[in-house]
Amino acid sequence: MKTSQNKSFLTCKDYTVSGENFELIYNDHQDILITQPQPSPEDLPKYYQSEDYISHTDASKKFSDKLYQGVKNVMLQKKVKLINSLVNSENKSLLDIGAGTGDFLKTAKQKNWKVRGVEPNSAARKLAKEKEIHLVEDISLISPEEKFDVISLWHVLEHIPDLDLQIEKFHSLLNRNGYLIIAVPNFKSYDASYYQEFWAAYDVPRHLWHFSKEGMVRLLESHQFLFQKTLPLVFDSFYVSLLSEKYKTGKSNFLKAFRVGMKSNLKAKRTNEYSSLIYVFKKA
């Protein structure tokens, strides 16, 4: 990724695993934030070794976990409805990157999608296998001859180290007129500005990149994708605010988190700066 006119934006703490501090550097050319220092590929897996890393488990121990799992079940249907609206054919194919425990692919498979998935975490792959969803560890294990109608990344792009290279790979794996769907946090949302360094969606150092709408569109258009639309993830502001309250105060202040999450969504009705956004791109 090219860098120019970089300046310090925030210092954030890893509240999930290490307790280490990381700098967020603003790149004005790309209109994104970059986590510094970025862990090496060898060190990165250790920052995911936590029972709190919910996307690699099906656990529902804490209230926030139960909230996450409950919302996830609602969103699975909405996600499949979205991909069905984009592709109208008998032999439709889907590749999900960072497939976690395979629930999205399982739901899509039930709606007659031919599904493939990539998930580096072995425990998550094992849980997916129990649902009869077989995932590969790395995208390099997907044959270049395989082509897909949709490639999806649900809160995954921000985790990928070699960003430009991987986006080129997605482009090559898509069918002509195929779609790339990306969901990521939005650092220009109200809840991000309210919580500042305590905003849970910064999630350093697992989140290596932090996107604005302008930055995301600029990045993907530079890789021969055509921007189609954004869609809001309205539940994210509540879940992220709940975690952020815990980081900021040490307490789970449900009422305060609800108020901040609601205010973020109400402001976003005017600005479209939701806590997280789904981007739909078409292969050019």
Across the structure, where does each feature detected by a protein language model lie?
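Conserved N-terminal segment of class I S-adenosyl-L-methionine
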Residues: 1-154, 164-167, 232-233, 244-245, ...
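A SAM-dependent methyltransferase catalytic signature shared across enzymes that methylate proteins
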Residues: 2-8, 213-231, 256
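Short catalytic micro-motifs in class I SAM-dependent methyltransferases
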Residues: 154-161, 183, 206
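Short N-terminal helix/helix-N-cap motif within the alpha/beta-hydrolase-1
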Residues: 161-165, 192
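A short glycine-rich, Lys/Arg-flanked "PGG" loop and its adjoining helix->strand segment in the class I
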Residues: 164-179
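Short, glycine-/aromatic-enriched active-site segment of Class I SAM-dependent methyltransferases
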Residues: 182-209, 214-219, 242-246
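Conserved catalytic loop of SAM-dependent methyltransferase domains
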Residues: 228-256
